[in-house]
């Protein structure tokens, strides 16, 4: 690691759970960061594979490593990160989130911090910076140069409506400033994911900045695989029960997704509604009410507030029918 005297300290938060296999590689990549001063805070969520013991070993040999013990038990990933963010909020100026199984590229902190300072220089406000990722397999072999291209994700424009409806930000690439932490914390129970919540607050009362360059080797393995291919043909009759079951499952999943994002929108309205533009506030308030509506009113609201031209006719129709 190389540092400069002017480099601000970045507090890194990492929630762990049974991550012993890849944690050492993550730590090596953190120590290799260019022009960066950092501390890392871990919170383990009840691992039984030796993760906690490995974290204690890291902490015993490097004063920059801290393991928090808050006696809250298993919280799940969203609220484990929420607890970490809350823990560092009183002292941190800048915070990055990290996933236990990823590897950071050496320039990650340097270019993210440069963009942060540019954004803060234009207008002091809550800022979230995020980047593209390079997709790799479990052994770090290349899969795709761009996660955004692989998943057809367009990070811009980052409007309130887009961010409320779709998670545009990947937590492992995020850098946030103190002004955003002051607005976003504590992470509410209604948050779908901690990174989604941070992005929603940032776009509502500050700035979301996207860097079109990978800074993370995004490891795909097991349940983490992106866009796993399915067989194109398995025999229509054999697949009929599967298709019926899938249709029912997708309908339930679509409904849950709408309700979860609507509940998160309600929490967003309560947190920063007064500082939103009138148009954004009208959208967030209306969208947050969807779970309380009857069938016809719900369909109309989904058509009005959830469907978007960029999704295409079929996706919008499916969303309205299933939602």
Model-derived segments and spans:
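C-terminal subregions of glycosyltransferases and related glycan-biosynthesis enzymes
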Residues: 164, 190-192, 196-197, 217-323
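Nucleotide-sugar donor-binding/catalytic module of glycosyltransferases
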Residues: 2-231
């Amino acid at each position: 690691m190389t540092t400069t005297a002017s480099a601000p300290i970045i507090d890194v938060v990492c929630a762990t759970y049974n991550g012993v296999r890849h944690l050492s590689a993550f730590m090596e990549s953190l120590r290799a960061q260019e022009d960066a001063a950092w501390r890392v805070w871990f919170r383990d969520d009840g691992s039984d594979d030796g993760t906690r013991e490995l974290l204690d070993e890291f902490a015993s040999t490097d004063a920059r490593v801290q393991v928090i013990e808050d006696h809250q038990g298993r919280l799940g990933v969203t609220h484990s990160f929420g607890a970490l963010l809350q823990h560092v909020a009183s002292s941190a100026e800048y915070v990055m989130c990290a996933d236990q199984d990823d590897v950071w590229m050496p320039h990650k902190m340097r270019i993210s911090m440069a963009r942060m300072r540019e954004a803060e220089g234009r207008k002091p406000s809550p800022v979230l910076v995020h980047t593209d990722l390079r997709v790799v397999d479990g052994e770090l072999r290349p899969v795709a140069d761009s996660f955004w291209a692989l998943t057809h994700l367009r990070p811009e424009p980052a409007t309130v409506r887009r961010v409320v409806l779709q998670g545009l930000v990947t937590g492992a690439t995020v850098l946030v400033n103190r002004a955003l932490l002051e607005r976003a914390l504590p992470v509410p129970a209604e948050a779908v994911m901690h990174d989604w919540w941070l992005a929603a607050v940032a776009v509502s009362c500050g700035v979301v900045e996207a860097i079109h360059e990978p800074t993370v080797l995004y490891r795909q393995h097991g349940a983490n695989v992106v866009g796993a291919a399915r067989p194109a043909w398995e025999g229509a009759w054999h697949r009929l029960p599967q298709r019926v079951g899938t249709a029912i499952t997708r309908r339930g999943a679509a409904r849950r997704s709408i309700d979860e994002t609507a509940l998160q929108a309600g929490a967003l309205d309560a947190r920063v509604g007064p500082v939103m533009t009138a148009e954004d506030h009208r959208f967030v308030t209306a969208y947050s009410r969807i779970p309380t509506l009857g069938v016809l009113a719900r369909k109309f609201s989904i058509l009005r507030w959830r469907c978007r031209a960029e999704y295409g006719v079929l996706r919008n129709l499916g969303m309205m029918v299933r939602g």
